[in-house]
Every structure is written in C-alpha cells, then in structure tokens.
C-alpha cells in the first residue's frame, strides 16, 4: 500500500524570494508527503550541488526548472512503484540515477526534495508523526535551540566578521520554557539596541544586524540582554558563535576586513581561546576554514575539552569528511544540514557516525528557508539534542520552533529536554 504512484515537483519561493524545489509524493493508499528544499548563503566548497538553471531571463538565473523537470520526469520514471517505506533503497536508487559524486547532474535540490517527501508520505501512510517514523519508539529528546540573535558576516551588512552570535537556553527545564527565555532575551536585546541608537531590522535568519565594531561588542550586548531579561549567563543561558571562517580565510590568513585585523592560524586559535575564557561560550562553529585541517587540529587541541567545536563547512554532513575528522581528532561535533549531502539516508548515516565516535550532532536550517519544518522532526528523530534554526522572528524560523512545541506537547511526560547534557562543555 506504500507504493509510489505519483511524484509532483514544483518551483516555489524561499524566504529570500529565490526559487527552490518543492516535491509531493503520493502513495497507492492516498497518503501524501510534501517537502521543500532549503538553500544556503555561505556554502561550503564540498557541499552537494544545488542545481540552478542559469537562465538570466528567469529569476536572474536562479530558477530551478531543470531540477523540477528531473523530479517530474527522470526521477519519477526511476522510482515510481517503489515502496515508500524502503527509504534506503529509494535513496540509493536516486544516487545511482544521478551518477555523480556531488549530485551535480540531477541536483541535490531535486534528490533531497524527493527523499524527504518519500519519508513524509510513508509516515503519513503509517499514521505516525515523522519523528516517530524515522526515529522509532525512543525518539523523545527535545533539542536545545541555538538562537541566532545577532548577525554579521555574509548574513549582514555590518563590520562584524563572524556570522552568528547565538544564545542557548540550556538551563531551562523544558523546550517550551527555553523558547520563552529566548524570546524574552530577543525582545530585551531589541530594546537595548534601539536605546543605543542601532537599527533593529532583522536579517535572513531573523537576527539583528547592528553596526557594531567587533565580535566582543556583539557579545557584550547579548550578555547585557540576558541579564536584563532576568537570566544568568553561564548558568541559565550560554553563548555560541558561528565564525564562518572560510568566508574570510584568504592566502593562508584570517582577514577580518570589517574589524581591520589580520590573524594567522596560531593567532586565530589564540583569539578564539581568549573569547572562550572571557565569555560563557560553549559552542563555536567553523572557527577555522573548511580546508584548514592544521588550524582545526590546533583549535581542537587548545579548547576542544571545554568547548563544542562544530564542523559545518568542514564536514558538510559528509561521512567521508567526518571520518577524516574523527581519525585526525579534529572538531568534536558536526552540523547536520540535509541539503549539504542531499538525501535523508546519508543525513542519518552522518548523525550515526558522529554519535558512535562520541561527537555531538546539531540539526540545522539554512539561511534560505521555507515554511517546511522537517528538520524539527529530524532533530527529535535522531536524539541529537541541539537544533540551529535562527532567531525568534520570521515565520520561516518560528515554523520549526512551533513544530517542536507541538512535538513536546504530544510526547507529554515521556518528553525529555536535552538541556546541559547536550553540550560537551557542560555534560
């Protein structure tokens, strides 16, 4: 009864007004699964290929008509009739059909849309929520939200070179309370920025992009907001950074153009270690550039015992790159973005490999999102304990938080909030 009888791809708009792929998968019993594919602004060089048309007469070249055509034609022809519950078999067939190492022929956006829609259709057919269908009976851990409330780097037009400044309400007793804490801090920060004469418009991920001079200035503003909202930094709420260092790593050095500073590899590590010592920072994402394996090893040896070091551009949700990181003792956590690798099975494989090696996993959105809340279910399904899905503004971000609220309510007494145990520095 879970045989695939129809696959319908379409071009929709993401949160930045750019086209993306949405896919409906219809099963023999009438069950329907729908998935929309996200898109990143700062993308790693080793990510799977997001296929764009390149036709300047449509959407300034960013159309996804070729990917949609692949969904409606070649992909449906290949997997029509397959049983949707056989996810691994379907994903393997999609990879074989594409035939490239980076999904460059059909496009990761086409393959992922189908892969996720298949899982959602199968869950619907079984009468199960997606997190339970994918994760099984023990999927009940609600993740700590990593809320990006100040933006810099590629996500903002300000002098701050780091891309994201996040708060983590790890001391909260539940996900719902953690979300409330975050919202209260967000609004307190907004008032503080406004009172100081800063712009409070929000960026791609719902965070503020004030014209602050440095990372330290941003961290100080966030600390004050936490305290003014009535919470204790380093006890109730912790800080996190996404440096997105690949974006400013040029000619072997880290060139902070906004701040007017250049740091070599050793100086970059020393600077991050200094920030960890000075502030209650418990997680740093992409503290070193994606191919600076030497720098990553030095950073891990220096602060890895007291801070979560998350590889995003470094690992790109790819088991081959993660395997190298584990072998070399580089980083201690992986950021999981479904569209970096391009299928559900490969995403789950990356999380499983990380957990087996004692690495943490963080489920993540992209800066170009939709109302699709699949990653909320996947965060619970994988018991990863952390989710990164933006600030407390913009419905493309809050859609994921709201889905997690529903899941926590549905789980009732069996729900567990990951809290401090989710973070290597606090466990």
Swiss-Prot record:
Pfam families: Enolase_C (PF00113), Enolase_N (PF03952). GO terms for biological process: glycolytic process. Pathway: Carbohydrate degradation; glycolysis; pyruvate from D-glyceraldehyde 3-phosphate: step 4/5. The keyword Transcription regulation does not apply. (2R)-2-phosphoglycerate binds at residues 163, 337, 366-367, 388. Binds a second Mg(2+) ion via substrate during catalysis. It is found in: Cytoplasm; Secreted; Cell surface. One of its GO terms (cellular component) is extracellular region. The keyword Plastid does not apply. Its EC number is 4.2.1.11. The active site is at 205 (proton donor), 337 (proton acceptor). It is an enzyme of class 4 (lyase). GO terms for molecular function: magnesium ion binding; phosphopyruvate hydratase activity. NCBIfam families: eno. HAMAP family: Enolase. This is Enolase. The gene is eno.
